Amino acid sequence: MKYLPLILLLTVTTVQAADTFQQKVKDVFQKKTSVDYTDWYGKGDAAIAEFKGFNLGVYQDLKASVRDNEINIKMQYVTGPVRPDSDDFAQMTSALCETVFEPFVVPDYVRPTSWDDDTPSPLNFMYVDNLKQTEDDPVEKTVNGWKIKIERSVMKTTCSARKVN
């Protein structure tokens, strides 16, 4: 009985450590997208968000799941008042994937602050000018021990980042 407080403390600490990564990802979504904290729910060891509405100025269906050291995002255009060009949609959603992954995959990367600084982000491989560049094939790369994958098709983008070591 005298060890009960210690056991409870260790249990709470373990739960808080597991929630820290998920909470940080939720915070990025809160700042960079229309997905807010109320769109998230727990399912097993994952935090899942489902959002249908305007995001980045486009009506879309966005789904995200976060486990410890793993992020998955799927964005798909849903019929709405504004239909973007497929290439524009691919660019917007690719940029969002890069923005969400960046604080975790390349936390020390500093975005350029002057017009003549052309230091590329290690995640720039995710960006495309048009869908013809991708030919609907997934692009994968390992960056700082994270396996990054992005796949685009007409009006749909899926991306994931998973810590591999």
Question: What role is predicted for each listed range?
Answer:
Residues 3-13:
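Sec-dependent N-terminal signal peptides
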Residues 12-13, 34, 145:
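Short, flexible coil/linker elements and helix-boundary hinge sites characteristic
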Residues 16-84, 88-91:
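N-terminal leader/targeting segments
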Residues 103-165:
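Non-cytosolic coordination micro-motifs
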Residues 62-127:
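Long, charged/polar, surface-exposed segments that mediate recognition or autoinhibition
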